[in-house]
Amino acid sequence: MKYDIMGDIHGCFQEFKTLTTKLGYNWDSGLPIHPEKRQLAFVGDITDRGPASLQMIEIVWELVIKQKQAYYAPGNHCNKLYRFFLGRNVTIAHGLETTVAEYKALSSNEQAIIKHKFIDLYEQSPLYHILDNNQLIVCHAGIRQDYIGRADKKVQTFVLYGDITGEKHPDGSPVRRDWAQNYTGNAWIVYGHTPVKEPRFVNHTVNIDTGAVFGGKLTGLRYPEMETISVPSSLPFVPEKFRPIS
């Protein structure tokens, strides 16, 4: 099977549609379908900050759950939205407020439908995907070599948030270790979470979060070709979001 793996979309539906079209997907049915049966995979964070988070939920639910033609690994924003929909006490900030505003603008019936779809998508999706006979791992923030095959709390924290040190940058964002430098496995790990100006290949890992929602690009990785394709963001560029990997 051949895959096209999408970086963090964050509600940037138009960029997603443009990128998938560029990758050869046909939207005539209202969904991106590839004539050669390539399948999409998502590294998570499909919502928050961008203008069309609910549209992304609809599309990804349809592809992953109903059609079973795509793969989705949840990100930290997905986890927080899931907890919001469960009625947990979460802080509506850091992008969640845009998704909640879209949600609150719906009728109660429409709210019930989108809430059900996202909970369904989240609960039916694994923490990360191991594909192509263990040669490809799709996850949100990466995964350490010795964590592959596990899904305990420690692994969940790593996969959703990265290799956090517990320290904070001046803007409040967490300091993360560069785990990819220590990866020696043969399987390709494709992930996002930390915005980079260009796709970042280190050992057999690649970060494809090129900051679409921060005015960068939306990037897709063609696997097994290992070719990246990007489309520019329509949103304003926010340079401070593209921090050097420490």
Swiss-Prot record:
It comes from the Bacteria. Keywords: GTP-binding, Hydrolase, Nickel, Nucleotide-binding. Its EC number is 3.6.1.17. It is an enzyme of class 3 (hydrolase). GO terms for molecular function: bis(5'-nucleosyl)-tetraphosphatase (asymmetrical) activity; GTP binding; nickel cation binding; phosphatase activity. GO terms for cellular component: cytoplasm. Pfam families: Metallophos. Gene3D superfamilies: 3.60.21.10. The keyword Hydrolase applies. InterPro entries: Ap4A_hydrolase, Bis(5'-nucleosyl)-tetraP_PrpE, Calcineurin-like_PHP_ApaH, Metallo-depent_PP-like, MPP_PrpE-like, Ser/Thr-sp_prot-phosphatase. Asymmetrically hydrolyzes Ap4p to yield AMP and ATP. Belongs to the PrpE family. This is Bis(5'-nucleosyl)-tetraphosphatase PrpE [asymmetrical]. It comes from Bacillus cytotoxicus (strain DSM 22905 / CIP 110041 / 391-98 / NVH 391-98).
